[in-house]
């Protein structure tokens, strides 16, 4: 053939185009997630579409068929997302108050927002969101047992441990804290693990199929782990260490949700197991 492609030759048939399938799926999902950026999304889709054709990798009908396929698959995810209960995860003041009352009834110190001014807790009903890989009954079954009582010797020892570390910060400890802080305006803990995964995948020269599959596995695990974690947090409504000892001054901001169980640890455990 006299045609010379401008990208590496693929060993796969050209119809339907893999690039087209990616475009179709990505556009549908991005439209859901970023409704205010429709023009930008369509602009990038057109760039990707043209690149597939002008590179010599695919003819137009290859790309169009791939797009239609990707779009139809993504629409199933969009339909699921609209009914997964994430839209109700913020709850309301009566529900937040009920969680606090339950903790008090158990004789425990309830969590409260340490932000000034106080803000509503972060997605207190996210534990009710529909998981990808199991049902809501399994969320309850996976819920860990209770934390040590705030009145227990164990909790006193663990609070002292934190205070001693905070009171004697080292350069190494501070560096670790800032690397994993993942606060507002960052990729957050779950996105941090996506970044770690992406850097590793690049070194292995994975195909687009392996990239898509690996990210799907990783992020479904992160999502479902988050659901169980948030169910646990707001079931026990456990206070932050700074509530138990006012001398504890954190090296980063204090998250606006209960302490037990740790969200960072949950995300890290799920991601490390998958990777």
Region locations from a protein language model:
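Acidic/polar surface patches and capping/hinge elements
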Residues: 1-275
């Amino acid at each position: 053939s006299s045609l010379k492609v401008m990208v590496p030759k693929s060993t796969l048939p050209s119809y339907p185009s893999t690039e087209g399938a990616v475009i179709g799926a990505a556009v549908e999902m991005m439209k859901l997630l970023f409704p205010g950026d429709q023009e930008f999304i369509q602009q990038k889709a057109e760039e990707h579409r043209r690149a597939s054709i002008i590179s010599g990798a695919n003819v137009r009908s290859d790309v169009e068929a791939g797009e239609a396929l990707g779009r139809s698959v993504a629409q199933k995810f969009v339909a699921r997302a609209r009914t997964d209960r994430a839209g109700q995860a913020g709850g309301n003041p009566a529900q937040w108050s009920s969680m606090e009352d339950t903790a008090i009834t158990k004789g425990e110190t309830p969590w409260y927002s340490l932000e000034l001014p106080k803000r509503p807790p972060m997605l207190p009903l996210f534990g009710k969101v529909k998981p990808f890989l199991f049902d809501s009954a399994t969320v309850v079954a996976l819920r860990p047992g209770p934390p040590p009582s705030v009145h227990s010797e164990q909790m006193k020892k663990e609070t002292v441990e934190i205070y001693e570390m905070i009171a004697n910060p080292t350069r190494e400890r501070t560096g670790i804290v800032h690397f994993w802080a993942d606060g507002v305006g960052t990729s957050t803990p779950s996105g941090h693990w996506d970044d770690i995964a992406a850097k590793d995948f690049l070194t292995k020269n994975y195909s687009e199929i392996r990239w898509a599959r690996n990210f799907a596995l990783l992020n479904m695990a992160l999502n479902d782990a988050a659901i169980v974690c948030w169910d646990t947090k707001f079931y026990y409504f456990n206070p932050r260490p700074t509530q138990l000892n006012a001398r504890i001054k954190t090296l980063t901001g204090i998250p606006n949700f209960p302490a037990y169980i740790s969200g960072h640890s949950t995300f890290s455990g799920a991601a490390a197991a998958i990777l």
